[in-house]
Amino acid sequence: MPARTTQMLRDTPDAQARVSEAESLVRAARLFLFDSLDRLWATLLATGEVTMEARANARLAASHAVASAVRAIDLMYVAGGASSLYASCPLERAFRDVHAMTQHIGVHPRVMHSTGRVLLGLEPDTPLL
């Protein structure tokens, strides 16, 4: 329940809309990630190798999944209002955890640069791919 109100957060139209948007973000990102990993695995089984394109696509999907998770949690964090600031609120922990994920080298913004290079037919500029 948000601070200074008797209405449950789940009963507010704003929270309901944000939940819908967050759900669509997470589901779409999950499908993209699983699809890219399925394609990578199929390529590996068929050829014994993983192509640069498949690796770039999987890395892109992972980065997108993290960005989508951040956006989804941010939507809920804002909906929670000032209550989201308190350690007793589950949104506070989710906010910290999801933003901590953004600091991982595997989803660093530079990954988008490298995957973009591969998508444009250029060599990646990082050994991570």
Could you say what each language-model-derived stretch is?
Residues 20-27, 59, 63-70, 96-99, ...:
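Generic structural signal for well-ordered, non-transmembrane alpha-helical segments
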Residues 28-60, 77-85:
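C-terminal helix-coil-helix/basic helical segment that borders enzyme active sites and/or dimer interfaces
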Residues 7-10, 14-17, 24, 46-60, ...:
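A structural signal for alpha-helical segments
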